């Protein structure tokens, strides 16, 4: 007989019981996201999902993303309830710009030591994002990995699949001289530029929880969840001839708008058509950030830009604003052989 202590997985830092407790905690909110096409429930080796029958030539569209270092700010401020919405938004907004309806979503949650309350708050936020975008949360991976993450740190990633009719894919090929650009207002910095945000907070010595901006803590502005545009944009696509949609994420105006422009076209943005939300003015002032850098790093109050024919503008604005969006005409498309694909004037 040996006197050696018998070791368990829990002794090594992996608590299977905590993982099971998390599954029990989130089952209810996950169930609310279920679409009729989804087969089976949580716990299978894989999730099954049929294609909606309304599509004649369905094309699957997929995307994966994270939330960048906004997660670091969320962890530092111990506010975990909306970061899951950000995660879903970053994925589904990328799908809908191609005309795709999100079908299902999977998440990856990794941590050194699983805190059931924190993980439950994050995944509840993911479920809320799925509800807002009409897609099902069909599964995920919760990885407890001792020694891989410091303290209570965690990381999240998301993966989404959507579907679009082949003949209705939006790829920017129809964009032409004279098209009008419509902006959809953002809820804040969304999930991009947060390494610069955190550097500005560090250099300025500002406490985002005690610094007020427009009558509420700066932290509320910085952690406002990314706006999910899916339902508004899908209705717009059904009723209006949309030529292109750009999701303003990393790279801001300069990098994202050209992704949907054909050769020999240029987007001309009218800077006087909107005022930056105060959080962007604060960031620019506190960090002494140049204007060009602001437009390269942040959305500056614009979450999406939609290109469509001029005769469709009034109808589009009415539809979008009726659905709760802050939408306005922000610019036009011009024929141009310039290497500068976007002009802000």
From Swiss-Prot:
Pathway: Purine metabolism; IMP biosynthesis via de novo pathway; 5-amino-1-(5-phospho-D-ribosyl)imidazole from N(2)-formyl-N(1)-(5-phospho-D-ribosyl)glycinamide: step 2/2. It is an enzyme of class 6 (ligase). It comes from the Bacteria. GO terms for cellular component: cytosol. It is found in: Cytoplasm. It catalyses: 2-formamido-N(1)-(5-O-phospho-beta-D-ribosyl)acetamidine + ATP = 5-amino-1-(5-phospho-beta-D-ribosyl)imidazole + ADP + phosphate + H(+). Its EC number is 6.3.3.1. SUPFAM superfamilies: PurM C-terminal domain-like, PurM N-terminal domain-like. Transmembrane segments: none annotated. InterPro entries: PurM-like_C_dom, PurM-like_C_sf, PurM-like_N, PurM-like_N_sf, PurM_cligase. GO terms for molecular function: ATP binding; phosphoribosylamine-glycine ligase activity; phosphoribosylformylglycinamidine cyclo-ligase activity. GO terms for biological process: 'de novo' IMP biosynthetic process; adenine biosynthetic process. Keywords: ATP-binding, Cytoplasm, Ligase, Nucleotide-binding, Purine biosynthesis. HAMAP family: AIRS. Belongs to the AIR synthase family. This is Phosphoribosylformylglycinamidine cyclo-ligase. The gene is purM.
């Amino acid at each position: 007989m040996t006197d050696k202590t018998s070791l368990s997985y829990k002794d090594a830092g992996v608590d299977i019981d905590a993982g099971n407790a998390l599954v029990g905690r989130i089952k209810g909110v996950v169930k609310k996201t279920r679409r009729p096409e989804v087969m089976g429930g949580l716990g299978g080796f894989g999730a099954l999902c049929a294609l909606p029958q309304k599509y004649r030539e369905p094309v699957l569209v997929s995307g994966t993303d994270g939330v960048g270092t906004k997660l670091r700010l969320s962890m530092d401020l111990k506010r975990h309830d909306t970061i899951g919405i950000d995660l879903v938004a970053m994925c589904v907004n990328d799908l809908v710009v191609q005309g795709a309806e999100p079908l299902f979503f999977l998440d990856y949650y990794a941590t050194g030591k699983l805190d059931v309350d924190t993980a439950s708050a994050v995944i509840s936020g993911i479920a809320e994002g799925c509800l807002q975008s009409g897609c099902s949360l069909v599964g995920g991976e919760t990885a407890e990995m001792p020694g891989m993450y410091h303290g209570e740190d965690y990381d999240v990633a998301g993966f989404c699949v959507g579907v679009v009719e082949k003949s209705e894919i939006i790829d920017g090929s129809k964009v032409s001289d004279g098209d009008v650009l419509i902006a959809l207002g953002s809820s804040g910095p969304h999930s991009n530029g947060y390494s610069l945000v955190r550097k500005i907070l560090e250099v300025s010595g500002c406490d985002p929880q005690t610094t007020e901006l427009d009558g509420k803590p700066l932290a509320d502005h910085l952690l406002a969840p990314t706006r999910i545009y899916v339902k508004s944009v899908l209705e717009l696509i059904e009723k209006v001839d949309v030529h292109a949609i750009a999701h303003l994420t990393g790279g801001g105006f300069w990098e994202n708008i050209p992704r949907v422009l054909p050769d020999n076209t240029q987007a001309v943005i009218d800077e006087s058509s909107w005022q930056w939300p105060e959080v962007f003015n604060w960031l620019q002032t506190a960090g002494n950030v140049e204007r060009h850098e602001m437009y390269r790093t942040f959305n500056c109050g614009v979450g999406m830009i939609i290109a469509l024919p001029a005769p469709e503008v009034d109808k589009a604005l009415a539809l979008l604003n009726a659905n709760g969006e802050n939408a306005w005409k922000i610019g036009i498309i011009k024929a141009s052989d310039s290497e500068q694909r976007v002009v802000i004037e």
